[in-house]
Amino acid sequence: MLLFRADYNNYAVSELQKLRFDEDEFYKKYDNCVLVQTCNRIEIYFDKNAKIIDINEFAEFEMIKSNNAIKHLLRTASGLNSMIVGEDQIIGQIKNSHRKAKELKKTTKYLDTIFLKAIHTGQKVRNNTKINKGCVSIGSAAVQLAEKTVGLNNKNILVVGAGEIATLVAKALIEKNIRAIVVSNRTYERAELLAKKLNGMAVHFDKLGEAINYNDIIICATGAPHAIIDKDRLKNIKGYKVLIDIANPRDVSDDVMELPNIKLYTIDDLKMVSEENLKKRKDEIPRVEKIIEEELSVLTKQLRKLKFENTIKNYDLYIENLRKREMNKALNMIENGKDPTVVLEKFSKVFANKLISDFVNIVNDDTIGDIERVVNKLNKNKI
């Protein structure tokens, strides 16, 4: 397998945005692959036999090959490569990415085997270790960041968005001593649904400016393709406001930082929270690594078996094509009056000789030992 990857370790989130692919356009161009894109990572997994049309398209990405690429996926599914170590969302993201590629008929049996094992490994890790206990999502990390920087007691909080990440933010907020929670979303019904779970209030998206004005902390997590909050929208806002933008692409434009009463935090700032999170989970990492190694060993055997099955399938196809070709020659000879017994004798000899000659032509010093062992076993098992 071949992997091209870029994530929060080597790029700021704003830079990652520029590297993101339009999924539909990507899959029109490439086959035999799975594209995994989250708020802080972009990873493209190619089948070992895939043809990469434009290698320059991945010039900004780190390239990882073979077993290292496979192990990376298992570690990612287990939450070890996440900014928030042990977070659960990555399993669903990997599962959804694989499902989309499969629906588009872009995966292979080889990739399917690896991705299913990665998902299984991630689930096993969380069921058998404590790697995902405590603050283990981007949403909960954003709330923790707000608590550390400005405090949450008696604050009014505005959550912009009502999707998966916004819901994680909401879940983390429920436990805090907050004065009020407000939810705004482009689809008002979704905002209303989330607000109801929080005993909060929903506001229409066209009233977002007013909602910002009346809240102390604004956490943005929409799926908008472009910034929805900029300097112009905030220039008349009164009072000190803290904005935490955990969307990707970003919801808040950088120009808001020019306003003296606005403090902006982004996903990059969550690294402070992630470092504390890592300390709490350090003792669990060896247990996770052990499970990964065990599952990787099982996967290696599965892939070896898969490779053998493909080899047998290809060899069977080769023999069948050879049989048909020689049989047609034999049938023509019989139709032209040749003795069937003589023809069958000739057919069997030509067929056997052709098998041997084709076989001998591809043998070299590197393969002779393996072939010798196979032939010896065949002779021992001969009928």
From Swiss-Prot:
<dbReference type="InterPro" id="IPR015895">
    <property type="entry name" value="4pyrrol_synth_GluRdtase_N"/>
</dbReference>
<keyword id="KW-0521">NADP</keyword>
<dbReference type="GO" id="GO:0019353">
    <property type="term" value="P:protoporphyrinogen IX biosynthetic process from glutamate"/>
</dbReference>
<feature type="site" description="Important for activity">
    <location>
        <position position="72"/>
    </location>
</feature>
<feature type="binding site">
    <location>
        <begin position="161"/>
        <end position="166"/>
    </location>
    <ligand>
        <name>NADP(+)</name>
    </ligand>
</feature>
<dbReference type="InterPro" id="IPR000343">
    <property type="entry name" value="4pyrrol_synth_GluRdtase"/>
</dbReference>
<keyword id="KW-0627">Porphyrin biosynthesis</keyword>
<keyword id="KW-0560">Oxidoreductase</keyword>
<dbReference type="GO" id="GO:0050661">
    <property type="term" value="F:NADP binding"/>
</dbReference>
<dbReference type="InterPro" id="IPR036343">
    <property type="entry name" value="GluRdtase_N_sf"/>
</dbReference>
<dbReference type="Pfam" id="PF01488">
    <property type="entry name" value="Shikimate_DH"/>
</dbReference>
<comment type="function">
    <text>Catalyzes the NADPH-dependent reduction of glutamyl-tRNA(Glu) to glutamate 1-semialdehyde (GSA).</text>
</comment>
<dbReference type="InterPro" id="IPR006151">
    <property type="entry name" value="Shikm_DH/Glu-tRNA_Rdtase"/>
</dbReference>
<dbReference type="InterPro" id="IPR036453">
    <property type="entry name" value="GluRdtase_dimer_dom_sf"/>
</dbReference>
<feature type="binding site">
    <location>
        <begin position="38"/>
        <end position="41"/>
    </location>
    <ligand>
        <name>substrate</name>
    </ligand>
</feature>
<feature type="binding site">
    <location>
        <position position="82"/>
    </location>
    <ligand>
        <name>substrate</name>
    </ligand>
</feature>
<feature type="active site" description="Nucleophile">
    <location>
        <position position="39"/>
    </location>
</feature>
<feature type="binding site">
    <location>
        <position position="93"/>
    </location>
    <ligand>
        <name>substrate</name>
    </ligand>
</feature>
<protein>
    <recommendedName>
        <fullName>Glutamyl-tRNA reductase</fullName>
        <ecNumber>1.2.1.70</ecNumber>
    </recommendedName>
</protein>
<comment type="pathway">
    <text>Porphyrin-containing compound metabolism; protoporphyrin-IX biosynthesis; 5-aminolevulinate from L-glutamyl-tRNA(Glu): step 1/2.</text>
</comment>
<dbReference type="InterPro" id="IPR015896">
    <property type="entry name" value="4pyrrol_synth_GluRdtase_dimer"/>
</dbReference>
<comment type="subunit">
    <text>Homodimer.</text>
</comment>
<comment type="similarity">
    <text>Belongs to the glutamyl-tRNA reductase family.</text>
</comment>
<feature type="binding site">
    <location>
        <begin position="87"/>
        <end position="89"/>
    </location>
    <ligand>
        <name>substrate</name>
    </ligand>
</feature>
<dbReference type="GO" id="GO:0008883">
    <property type="term" value="F:glutamyl-tRNA reductase activity"/>
</dbReference>
<dbReference type="Pfam" id="PF00745">
    <property type="entry name" value="GlutR_dimer"/>
</dbReference>
<dbReference type="InterPro" id="IPR036291">
    <property type="entry name" value="NAD(P)-bd_dom_sf"/>
</dbReference>
<dbReference type="Pfam" id="PF05201">
    <property type="entry name" value="GlutR_N"/>
</dbReference>
